[in-house]
Amino acid sequence: MPPKPFNFPAKRTTAIFLLTTTAASSAFTANSDDSSPHAADKFRAQIHGIVRTARAVSAVASTVVDYEFSLRGLPKHSDQYRKTSSQVHLRSAERFLKLCEANKGFYVKAGQFIASQKVLPTEYSSTLSSLQDQVAPLPFKVIEKVLKDNLGPDFSKKFLSIDERPIGAASIAQVHHAVLKSGQEVAIKVQYPWIEQQMHFDTRTMYFLSKTIAWIYPQYRFEWLPLTFAKTVSSELDFVQEGRNSERAAENFRNNKIVRIPHIFWEMTTRQVLTMQYYTGHKIDDLDFLSEIGVNPEKVAKSLMELFAEMIFVHGYIHGDPHPGNILVSPGGRNGFSLVLLDHAVYRELDEEFRKDFCQLWEALALKDSKKTMWLGERFGAGKYSRYLPIIFTGTTIESKYSSGMSIKEKEIMKQELKSLMFEDLSLFMESMPPDFIAILRVDALLRSTIRKMDVSRLIRLLTYTKYAVYGHFHPKLDSELCKRPKTNFYFAVKAAFLSFISTLKYFHILIKILIGANNSTPWQQKVKNLLHNYLYRKIGSSDLWSILVHSVFLLFCICPAT
């Protein structure tokens, strides 16, 4: 019997053309302003935006047809359906990769944003992860006009020199090296003059396209993606807020001897211009540079994980874009290197109750406490998907005995469980989780990618997260200004010292349980045991233990310095 002719449903056809036409026209009218002296430039930008929108519509329409036609008639839980779905995912990801490369700008940032979403199909994340946010720099005449508009017509008098050749150019801004009258080297981040208009145009198009897909396929609940992305890029356009974020992060790590955060020069900072202290360095995953300066990549990776573990579990204030280009390694300083943290445009402040619950979740994951993991998953809203939290964060199943790895049998069980999950399960899971959880997932995915490139053990992440989760669970959130006042801070300091001591004991207890869990005869598990043994007795040896205990007693001076 010949196959039935394929009739593309009318709902699919009308949805794509009606909603995307609405997206383009509304974006056009929203940005029209014929009375502006720059009306001609705006008109050209709008035409360019419509061309970009047309490419996006074409890519989405082709993808919808591909999914509809390729999966038609296949039983949802069959091996053929899964195999075909993977093929369609890959074709669609490659289609969107071409779209992002053609449209550049915010489409590249959107592709990178999607690639960092850990729970999306791997075909999308692996394909789109190749995107690079690099563009050809604008002529300095254009940049000079932005500087004059923001810093005044005589802005050049504030500098000894400004290098007209940018040291970096991305989709939103480019950066120039300069020297102040005082001799201080600075980096000037200058926003492109047309970028805000383009952002509104592109994000509006992305939102309407996502609405189109949600209408066609109600089971795919990914409308949160463009909304989250739009909020993220919108915050990136406010350089004043970026400066405030930078200062708050610097305050949080004021006692850290390894982390460097550029100082902000407020008298030369506006919404479109950010002037900051200039640092040199190389990307954190540049292994050739680390070898050249004689620094062990494992030490660098550990410092990176400690930095972000403290952000997540203790401060609850997280840098939202920790890709290697935003974290430089600079020679000198403690242990022979320092970490320079750049680009503070996007931060996430965690709800305090969520932060405490997430600390407990990580403790439960480390201890393989399945009951507590399921209970906390229910609190987060994961429901039946709570059993997959260990897979997401530790790469083990809810039934795994050890957090350091899985047996061959457990791997087979996990493989079968994951086979039963459908694409709509992923979208339902992501929609049900709180925004704080999604933010941590994204940051954690970027960090894991970096340490994987550095070729260091994933146990560094596991142990570091566990250490700070335990501390963050017990550590009281102290107001830094209150702590700086003499006499009034004594109670808080004593309480913090006691809780720090208790958390140290609990951390050692968890480490020992992980160590015992890795105590068996297989070569791979013996290797895990040796690594953990080294971590416990070499990294946290007797001298360091005394240091920790002394730190607990004298936390008054470490956390709450008197003025």
Q: Where on the chain are the PLM-derived regions?
A:
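Residues on conserved beta-strands of the protein kinase catalytic domain
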Residues: 172, 184, 271-272, 338
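Hydrophobic residue at the +6 position relative to the catalytic HRD Asp in the kinase catalytic loop
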Residues: 325-329
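ATP-dependent phospho-/nucleotidyl transfer catalytic cores
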Residues: 129-136, 148, 196-204, 211-318, ...
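Long, charged, glycine-rich C-terminal linkers/tails
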Residues: 154-167, 252-273, 460-466
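Helix-rich C-lobe and terminal helical cap/extension of kinase-like folds
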Residues: 86, 90, 117, 227, ...
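Conserved beta3 strand of the Hanks-type protein kinase catalytic N-lobe
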Residues: 178-179, 322
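N-terminal accessory/targeting segments that precede structured cores
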Residues: 1-174, 182-184, 194-224, 428, ...
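Conserved beta3-strand ATP-binding lysine motif
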Residues: 189-191
